[in-house]
Amino acid sequence: MPGGGFSRIPPSLKAQDGQPDGDGDDGRFTLGSFSIDEYRPIKVIVIGAGFSGILAGIRFPQKIPNVDLTIYEKSAGIGGTWYNNRYPGVACDVPAHCYQFSFEGKRDWSAFYSPGHEIQAHLQEVVDKYKLMRYIRLSHEVVHARYDEPTGKWHVRVRRTRPSSSSPPDSGEGEGEPHQGEEEAEEEEFEDVADVLLTAFGAITRWKMPAIPGLADFKGELHHTAGYTPRSGRTWEGDLERWRDMRVGVIGSGSTAIQVVSALAPHVARLANYVRGQTWLAPPFSMDMVQDLLGRSKKAAEDDDDLTLHPEEIERFKSDPGYFDRVRHTLEDSMNRDSTMQSDFQKMFRKGMEEKLATRPHIAEKLIPGFPVSCRRLTPGPGYLEALCLPHVDFVSSPIKRFTATGIETEDGQTKELDLVFCATGYDTSWQLPFAIVGRGGVDLNTKWRPHPRTYLSVCVDGFPNMFMSLGPNSIIGAGVLLPILETAVGYAVQAAAKMQRERLRSIEVKRSAVRDFDRYMEHVDGDDDVGCGQSYFPQSVYSANCRSWYKLGKEEGRIIGLWPGSNLHAVKALQHPRWEDYEYERADPEENSLYWLGDGQTWNEKTENGDRAWYLREEFVDRPPGMLKRYAWLLAPI
């Protein structure tokens, strides 16, 4: 629909002077010259084209009329972490059938834990299906964002990279350094301006090499898992042939290291896994459901440790949508149970790990944690414990002392000669962003978020109007399905943009008191004598137990900045319907009339005598009640 703009209303539409209303004002009252649904243009900038950015590309044009949308992605392709991470064994660590949008139903996943390139390819299919490349700008990195208070606009500085003509952007040759004789990519910067800014990049984006002495002296092949790019082909399997006779080191014991060890151990000459901490490994989530869901025998279910789907099973998913929907619903229902908190599960996990490490009891002693299940991220890790038991695989628990030119020396005096080292040593999860976001009063978000981030429901920050976040601080879950939270968080930002457009608002900003109260809900706040630790969420949870976790900035103790304070279903309910009274507003128009957005008393179809004036009878708008209302139907309905 045409936009109403920001212009003042012609004097002819203003009320006559000298006719004060009942409140005793001076009688000046302004009506808008636009229809109530003649929505003004609104510009939205999204940073990142992973799951959140792709969803924003679908929902903003779907829900917001007259929207101008741009999605800036610094990488050369879409998919976020699934485009950038190509390390050996990269895969989804939850059933892939649950790792897709609620309105998309990919039925031909090759495995329950699908490889990363398959997830990225699916996201590309979604982008193509909804024609989102018209909004997405690849190789465009946001380097600065500043809120302008007088106009209520975000000024976003963008660095555009143009690849050199001598090498394609995704050649897979090397680690981002120019090759000999290759021209460096050309860069230029420009500024874009928007009414609404949505950050959609999450915390797990900036990887870091470990601070180990001698790292630069190592003469072999060295990669951080997040920085690795295949040299041969588009996936890591293309490099297996040249790695086959190599001695490989893998540093780490988190979910990434577990996948790398599992993938490489069967294919290399020797492998050493350097492990500093302990970790729980659960049986693959779906193993106990395979028999019922796929109709396999018990023996077949136990034999398929990687949970690869058989061709006939994939074909049934494709040909029988009802069957696929039932399987997906069963998986997600089971994942959303908070069962990992129960002590009997801890006993079951311990028993399972001890059985698989029966021939390596010294590994079980070092690897099995003393802290509760879910204190750290729980991973199924299919094949990892089996890999540790192979004769050519070494489990090294002695701390690393230094790199040498040819390998790694540990504190116990042992040195292993290595040809290839993968550092699965994590990311900078401090939420100190790589670029400045400047809000009201010139406050930098990085400064505001020291020593740790504070938000409102993980989606916005006081002092930063018209800015929303998907996968912001305290948005991830320790157990359950993540995608419903992501969808609801993006939907929250869309609802806020719709409110701004409909009510002609210049700014919408969460109150500082609301941020403070969410902070109190999660943790005891320093200086708050009236809030005891036992009255906040995290001090009573398993996540506060002593274990090193990225939830707590990689520390054993400290504030939890990664997790939502509740279940994933709790997060969905909290974000589903915004509590607008927790916000403050500024109007876009100078008139004092707070109901200026009502316009001239007409709708656009009436005003133009065009279009459908009985649209409310169309099927998509009719809210049909069920034939027989059940007494407790409200418990099930998404109200």
Give the positions of each predicted feature.
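Feature captures the FAD/FMN-dependent oxidoreductase FAD-binding
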Residues: 110-204
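A conserved short coil-to-beta-strand element within the FAD-binding core of flavoproteins
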Residues: 138-155, 393-411
